[in-house]
Amino acid sequence: MTRSVRQVFFAFAAFAALIGAANVPSARSLAAAPSDDQAVIAADRAFEKAVAQDPVALAMQTDPAFTWIDATGTLQSRQEILDAFGAGSAPQLVVLTTAVDVQLTTRVYGRLAFVQVHAGRGYSLRVFAKGKDGWRTLHVIELTQPAQAAAASATGAAVPSEEGVITECVNPCKLVPFTPATPAAKAAFADWREMEMGSLTRNMDLWGRHVLDDVLIVDSGGSGTISKAQRIANTLKQKQAGVRTNEVPPVLWARTLDFGDAVLLLMLQQPYKGQPYYAARIYVNRDGRYQMAVSYHTAIASVPDFALSKQLPAK
């Protein structure tokens, strides 16, 4: 099955599959040593260099579980990317650390870390995992925002790609087509679902409990980044206007990568209006619960917009 066919299959066929998950997190503190910050930065620069010219080095710089979601919304595995070098079709980063006016951010959470590289309309999130051989690239998600932001909808979606309709929330509020495999992954996934319940009900206290203060949300349908404060303000504006739409996109597919106090959540979601998108989120164990540290959304360009009038019923 080709990647494009596989993506369409997810978007059309997986929508009806529904199962659930929940659990309770452990509580441990996270602290990053300065040497870890520098090691992650060095790993990111080595990854950039390998992507540009050296598949052998790329294999050495990436984790066996490495995946890459490019700006078109194409998901590729490590082996697919290495094979693409031989075919002359290897993906290229949309923005480099050497770009003019680049904005760089590095965060380390135990054995999981990320580097954000932003310049112009290009946004790149590189996620790194620490193993016995040091830091290796685990995941990349990228996006390019439109030159001109789309006109605001009548309901003023809090996140541009998540515009909703008035309908019951079945997936993910009640049932989800995914069961995390480990206690930490179950806890992070359960806290993500509780965060989304806050979004659905426009209860920003509940939503905010599961979001770190320095979080950045980056959406391929938006313009710039969205801070925690801005996301809350967007939703409260909706609430004051009486907007009651469901802006919690159903989950079609998910994957978790568990690093104890930090968990990477990868999802394919279908908004009620618009294209399906891949999301990459990192959840960190703080204050006895998992909280979102970063969230990137990249629409799948090869799949047309959907316009769903209501949530599909639970089976």
Model feature map: region roles:
Residues 9-21:
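Bacterial N-terminal signal peptides
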Residues 123-173, 276-306:
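Short beta-strand edge/turn micro-motifs at domain boundaries
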Residues 37-39, 80-122, 230-277:
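Surface-exposed, charged secondary-structure patches
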Residues 57-59, 66, 81, 115, ...:
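Hydrophobic pocket/interface hotspot
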Residues 1-6:
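N-terminal secretory signal peptides that target proteins for export/translocation
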Residues 65-76, 80, 88-93, 214-226, ...:
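A short gly/proline-enriched turn/hairpin at secondary-structure junctions
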Residues 26-64, 138, 144-205, 209, ...:
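Short, low-complexity N-terminal intrinsically disordered segments enriched in polar/charged residues
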Residues 62, 72-73, 118-120, 126, ...:
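A mature extracytoplasmic/lumenal domain signature
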